[in-house]
Amino acid sequence: MEFEVKKTSGKARVGVLKLPHGVVRTPVFMPVGTNANVKLLTPRDLEEAGAEIVLSNTFHLMLKPGVEIIRLHGGLHKFMGWKKPILTDSGGFQVFSLPKLKIDDEGVTFKSPIDGSKVFLSPEISMEVQIALGSDICMAFDHCPPPDADYEVVKEATERTYRWALRSKEAFKTENQVLFGIVQGGVYPDLRKKSALQITSIGFDGYAIGGLSIGEERSLTLEMTEITVEYLPEDRPRYFMGGGSPELILELVDRGVDMFDSVFPTRIARHGTALTWKGRLNLKASYNKRSLDPVDEQCGCYTCKNFTRSYIHHLIDRGEVLGQILLSLHNVSFMISFMDEVRRSIEEGTFREFKGKMIDVYSSGGVSV
């Protein structure tokens, strides 16, 4: 892996990340393909939208179809038909979202949400699975506490995250993939600082900010991000896990973050909402019924070049899956174009102006006509 910061504007930065399956320009948004697919979209759709990297989920793939099936195909890239870089998460976030966990320093024991069988996941198993998947970027196994956890619970999770990070690094025996460490610490400044110092002391290829944007106040999200970034090395990529709205991405880029992922754009598309350069657009609303406009006049995606708001409103109104497909394609295309403009504004020294304009647009309540 190679990472080079090419340009800065304040703390915002443009970089180039070279990975085994291709080059990724940062800041970058990564569409989420939980089960080795971005919902409703083909790899060709993603490529035409300009996606340079996607995220897939170790936890779900480990359970179904299982590592052996993916290994049979020659790895995750061939299994899902995607030739560009892939980042896999470690499974920690999903595991700690499940009820009735047994957690100790060895790992986590839980019931499979698929068939109820007992499953054990540890740093070593997570690394083994991710290496077998063959993703470009793997994530260390971490303990992500709930957003309402008290100080002592978060402190214990932070210490365990450090111990598990050491074991993840030790178990990561491959030269063809890279490993990112994850900083935890909840919403407690001293624990965020402590975790950042601990994780960076191990030495990873990149660093992720975990355990945020999971229900806490936005002001706390930004404060904890600032504290964390202060202790991360300048020459390594910084990844905010789970940040996906345009407004949040702008705030995080302004604080020095490089990489983002979220199901947000495709999830809201499936519920009839489009992201546009004028804000959110509700395609369920009746005012679209007679509109011959595209979803976004500034967008060049397949959806906007070929279909009207009226048609997509009709599809959504009738429950036709094509409406969800077309909006998913548009929203992913928008996010890729949005990140293009983020990078351009940093390169031109106009990022703060761009950020202010877009936050005003997205805080105004969205498009109504």
Curated annotation (Swiss-Prot):
Named in its record, the pathway it takes part in is: tRNA modification; tRNA-queuosine biosynthesis
Record-linked NCBIfam families: Q_tRNA_tgt, tgt_general
Please name the top-level EC class of this enzyme. Answer: transferase
EC? 2.4.2.29
Q: What is this protein called?
A: Queuine tRNA-ribosyltransferase
GO BP of this protein: queuosine biosynthetic process; tRNA wobble guanine modification; tRNA-guanine transglycosylation
Q: What are the binding positions for substrate in this chain?
A: 89-93, 142, 184, 211
Give the residues the record marks as binding Zn(2+): 299, 301, 304, 330
Subunit architecture: Homodimer. Within each dimer, one monomer is responsible for RNA recognition and catalysis, while the other monomer binds to the replacement base PreQ1.
Q: What is the role of this chain? A: Catalyzes the base-exchange of a guanine (G) residue with the queuine precursor 7-aminomethyl-7-deazaguanine (PreQ1) at position 34 (anticodon wobble position) in tRNAs with GU(N) anticodons (tRNA-Asp, -Asn, -His and -Tyr). Catalysis occurs through a double-displacement mechanism. The nucleophile active site attacks the C1' of nucleotide 34 to detach the guanine base from the RNA, forming a covalent enzyme-RNA intermediate. The proton acceptor active site deprotonates the incoming PreQ1, allowing a nucleophilic attack on the C1' of the ribose to form the product.
GO cellular component terms, semicolon-separated = cytosol
Q: Per UniProt, which keywords does this protein have? A: Glycosyltransferase, Metal-binding, Queuosine biosynthesis, Transferase, tRNA processing, Zinc
User: What gene name does this entry carry?
Assistant: tgt
Region: RNA binding; residue ranges are 242-248, 266-270
| Listed PANTHER family | QUEUINE TRNA-RIBOSYLTRANSFERASE (PTHR46499:SF1)
The UniProt entry's sequence similarity note says: Belongs to the queuine tRNA-ribosyltransferase family.
One Pfam assignment: TGT
Q: Out of the domains of life, which is the source?
A: Bacteria
What does the note under cofactor report? Binds 1 zinc ion per subunit.
A GO molecular function term, named singly, is:
tRNA-guanosine(34) queuine transglycosylase activity
